[in-house]
Design a protein with these regions (language model features):
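N-terminal leader/linker segments that initiate helical-solenoid repeat arrays
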Residues: 2-156, 462, 469-470, 474-521
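Residue-level recognition of tetratricopeptide repeat
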Residues: 119, 123-126, 163, 197, ...
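Conserved structural position within tetratricopeptide repeats
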Residues: 102-106, 139-146, 182-183, 213-217, ...
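Generic helix N-cap/helix-start motif at coil->alpha-helix transitions
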Residues: 152-158, 184-192, 219-227, 254-262, ...
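TPR/TPR-like (Sel1-like) alpha-helical repeat modules
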Residues: 216-220, 320-327, 337-354, 425, ...
């Protein structure tokens, strides 16, 4: 067999006995560890998980209805995950890739197996933060569509291309491709997680929420619940996000899937400024799936906040060695910079640039993280140019915040504040967003708003950045106390929320998320 570097082959004499009926993804009934407190995410979702109903992969992803089922093992596990858009172990994905490559070599007209191969390459690239897998994924997915176009029913390959576009941060293309599938087959549930990611990347949280509703109407289980939790988090509905992700972890059917939910719960705890809880969740994720290196970065972040600097440095270094995402390289560089280790910081920044250049060669747009890096580390004018272009492509909250900050660093605080306010309108609560607004407001002589936003940043997460959190405290001290004689009751009377609204942090997970689904989108 040719090496990975020699794939795809130049000559297509290309099918491995295709597994016919994949194993069920979701359990027939509730998970054994389920408690009475953790009811489903509202009545609509509960109805989807009726006892005795087994959700299986799309039949075409198995290679055809007449093919024998795969033997239990890594290929079957990866096939199930790939078909459901769920995370899979790297070793399982590698086995599936080898399996499908051997099959399509002798069965070049098996469009379903080409689609599986392309989606497996994508999953492998995401798992390793290695964008060199993306051209291979695209080649296999387009080969599938050449054999059987999307208009003739090859939705799996088109959904795979849309997911690949999301991975490359090309959210507009992802939305276009996924919407075509949805229009042809609105009951195909596998398209909705891709649409959710695309709409979120484009800053259209209402569109993402609509897609969540449609997904929950069609499908229950871990994948749907995790997708809803991610959207709730982006909208700032933290209790609802925690409820959905807790439920998703309970319904996960593989260690990798469960660990991914636990990692997201750790990230959510970090957003709230709860490093001990974040550490517990990320540690649980790593025990469940030791290969989940994103949780290792989250663990390092929490350790640093808890004063465990040596452990944080060790875990950050291990995380970026195994999962060299540009954002992790930036975080580690800023950690070194906060410790006065300038040479080590510069080494990580050089790795960041090299990784972004490699990603660019494989079709990945890293403009957001590059713009954030340039704004704070010596090239704000370049950051403004880069982020203006990115804003035209993907006008989401993170880009608005990064562009506003870059404008301030480039000497344009008035225009910068306009974008920072857009970020606040588009996104949920973010300590970094609040800090950026507070700094610009102080620069513009708006002491009251500056004080409120800097206080909000530290109240939301007092550990949000090893470089910037100390500056937020210094900025507050410089502003001093508000002048006496101001209004005592700034906000007026605010009634208590109605009983049973599901908005309290200690309420049941089901009622919290049910309340979120009733909100006006």
């Amino acid at each position: 067999m040719e090496s990975e570097d020699e794939w795809p082959p130049h000559r297509q004499t290309l099918t491995l006995p295709p597994p016919a009926r994949p194993t069920p993804l979701e359990p027939a009934g509730p998970p054994p560890a389920r408690t009475a407190r953790r009811t489903m995410i509202g009545a609509a979702v509960a109805a989807l998980l009726t006892a005795g109903v087994l959700v299986v992969l799309p039949t075409r992803f198995g290679g055809g209805q007449d093919a024998p089922p795969p033997a239990p093992g890594p290929v079957a596990r990866a096939l199930t995950a790939v078909g459901a858009g769920a995370p899979a172990a790297a070793a399982d994905l590698t086995a599936l890739i080898a399996d499908r490559r051997a099959w399509v070599r002798t069965h070049p007209s098996d469009d379903a197996s080409w689609a599986v191969l392309g989606s497996a390459y994508l999953g492998r690239g995401l798992r390793a933060a290695d964008s060199s897998y993306y051209p291979r994924a695209e080649w296999a997915l387009r080969r599938s569509l050449a054999v059987r176009p999307a208009a003739r029913g090859n939705a799996d390959a088109q959904i795979g291309l849309a997911a690949l576009a999301n991975a490359r941060h090309d959210y507009g293309t992802a939305r276009t491709l996924a919407e075509e599938v949805r229009r042809r087959d609105p009951k195909r549930w596998t398209v909705y997680p891709v649409l959710i990611d695309a709409y979120g990347g484009l800053g259209d949280l209402k569109g993402a929420s609509r897609s969540v509703e449609q997904l929950l109407d069609l499908r229950g289980g871990s994948v749907a619940l995790a997708a809803s939790g991610a959207v709730y988090r982006e909208r700032g509905w933290r209790e609802d996000a925690a409820a959905a992700l807790t439920e998703a972890a309970a319904y996960a059917t593989t260690p990798v899937q469960k660990a991914d939910c636990l990692r997201q719960l750790g990230d959510l705890a970090w957003d709230r400024g709860e490093p001990a809880e974040a550490l517990a969740q990320h540690s649980a994720a790593l025990r469940t799936d030791p290969g989940g290196h994103a949780a290792l970065a989250g663990k390092a972040r929490a350790e640093l906040a808890l004063g465990r600097t040596a452990a944080a440095r060790h875990d950050y270094a291990a995380a970026v060695a195994r999962l060299p995402r540009p954002e992790y390289l930036l975080e580690l560089g800023e950690l070194y910079e906060s410790l006065g280790l300038g040479a080590d910081a510069r080494a990580q920044y050089a790795r960041l640039r090299a990784r972004a250049a490699s990603d660019d060669g494989h079709g990945v747009n890293d403009a957001l993280v590059l713009g954030r890096f340039e704004a704070d580390h010596g090239a704000p004018e370049s950051a403004v140019e880069r982020l203006r272009a990115q804003w035209r492509r993907t006008p989401n909250a993170a880009v608005a915040d990064a562009l506003g900050w870059a404008l301030y660093r480039a000497g344009e605080p008035e225009e910068g504040l306009v974008f920072l306010k857009q970020a606040a309108e588009k996104g949920g609560r973010s300590a970094l967003f609040s800090y950026h607004r507070g700094v610009l407001e102080r620069e513009l002589g708006q002491s009251g708003p500056a004080r409120r936003d800097l206080e909000e940043a530290l109240r939301t997460n007092p550990y949000f950045s090893p470089l910037l959190a100390p500056k937020a405290r210094e900025g507050l001290e410089g502003l001093g106390e508000p002048a006496e004689g101001g209004p005592k009751d700034v906000y007026g009377y605010v009634p208590d929320p109605p009983t049973g609204s599901g908005s309290s942090g200690s309420g049941s997970s089901g009622s919290a998320a049910a309340a979120a689904r009733k909100r006006k989108q």
